[in-house]
Amino acid sequence: MNYQDNSLKSLKLGQKTEYASQYDRTLLQPVPRALNRDGLGITQNQPFTIGADIWTAYEISWLNEKGLPQVAIADIYLDYQSQNLIESKSFKLYLNSFNQSKFTDFNAVQQTMQRDLSECAQGDVKVRLNPVAVYDAQKINHLQGDCIDEQDIEITSYEFNANWLKDCVSNEIVEEKLVSHLLKSNCLITNQPDWGTDQAQQAILTARNNKLNFETQRKTAEQTLRNLLNLKPNEALNITFPHIMNVKTAGVNLNVPVSVIANRPDVKAAQFRLSSAFKNAKATQKSWFPEVNLGASLSSTASTVGTALHNPVAAGTVGISLPFLNWNTVKWNVKISEADYETARLNYEQRITTALNNVDTNYFAFTQAQSTLSNLQQTHSYNQRITQYYRNRYNAGVSELREWLVAANTEKSSQLAILNAKYQVLQSENAVYSSMAGYYL
């Protein structure tokens, strides 16, 4: 037999073979995946993150310790990252070598096969032995996804051409699951066609696009740091970035004087416009505008930010009272008209109200973000246990690989949600500091 590659000349396919009367692991013969992957340029980096070659062996048999024949059907999964496939004839010869060999139980046979196949494939291989009775209630189901076999298209060439794949690349981000029953590949050994069903889920572009966005955001943040530190592009930014889950929140302290919001630029500007209306600002400061802050500008029931946020609310805004700024109280010291003064006073009150509402809203968002993070952490803990549950069931041969992979994917999604929630906590905490014009102990 003429082979396409010299590495295949040692295979027993096409040769006369003797029946193996006892279990023999040396019958297995590998076929390197690189024979096909090198031509596609995907030997080192595959364009997918999960996958397996799945074999179903319908004629598994061995003897128990009393010499009684046992039968089973095996599901065998060769991980896509394994170095080798296993040549089909050698695979069948190997499985048949179990027929006249004694094993203690199902588990012993399963572990033996899994060990031998993993060594031959040089990768992860899972074996699940099922009693024949398991298939009594098994239904034939349709694969999830959109079948593309009924497209009204014309095909004129059946030769492999990798350039066609390049034309499929688009900037459009898509997420889809496609199914086809028309997968045909010619065997490297016999050049005969093998038919199969293929299910492909294309979501990798979305993941790559998100990664690019995150890298761009990080570069923008790095630029800001370089500007602040006056560093040139070729100078090292000697900063160690901690993992976001290790970043501790400083905490928000609302038990501080309301006067702290006087440091806000908008409040300070309104305060300046109002104070400029007086003939003698220094005299008025001692009477009703002490130390040029907002502490005396609020009602006596709102001496701290925390209590100010609990004042009666009307139409969704915090109500404040500034009786000492009434016209009758200060008209002797005002150098502008009553109308202009009232405009400045109202603007001043509105700025204070806006500032307090801003603090209130941001603090509420902060507490909500903390609750969300706590809930997601509990959810992730449950998902970890669910993944372990399905992994144990799969290793025990009572659950499908697909169920384990779905659970693992859900666990990873919840882990990403936790990272995003922690980021939201930090952002909302900083928003509170910003609305209070600083962090206060």
UniProtKB/Swiss-Prot annotation:
Pfam family, one: QueF_N
Alphabetized InterPro entries for the sequence: GTP-CH-I_C/QueF, OMF, OMP_efflux, QueF_N
Any single GO BP term: transmembrane transport
GO cellular component, one term: membrane
GO molecular function, one term: efflux transmembrane transporter activity
Domain of life: Bacteria
Gene3D superfamilies membership: 3.30.1130.10, Outer membrane efflux proteins (OEP)
Family the entry assigns: Belongs to the outer membrane factor (OMF) (TC 1.B.17) family.
Protein name: Uncharacterized protein HI_1340
Species this protein is from: Haemophilus influenzae (strain ATCC 51907 / DSM 11121 / KW20 / Rd)
